[in-house]
Amino acid sequence: MNALATDRWIEKRDPEELYAYIDVFACPISVADLTAEVHATMIRSRIKPLTEWNPGEIALYIALDCAAEDESHWVFELNVMLAKLRKERGDDVIISFRHEDQFGAFGKGGRELIQQNVDKAVEGAFMKYLEANFDLAPGEPKP
């Protein structure tokens, strides 16, 4: 299977807008800060950040979980992926993803180390999205 065929899973009807589902637990980086950073990255790439997801469409999923070791160090787990989100009863959410569309890290360190890993993983997933949905040479959506 070639790369183009596998990337069809992450293609969107309207690739110029994307929802980012962001979940942060007990970390030195807040949901609000991470959301602002991700939305700024999207806007720089001319992608409109959506405030609501359309179930069944590709979204950028970011989950960052931390446990404080002391006042300046955390153990962290980061998962960033292109995923299809499906809302179930109440607040339940099902997340479908493919392994090759997942980026992330496990580690222990300060806020700066966590931020570096978040930036790297978000950039990797976002580039995969752009490559699947746009012809990056002329800057137009794929036909």
Residues of each region from the PLM?
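Short acidic low-complexity segments
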Residues: 47-58
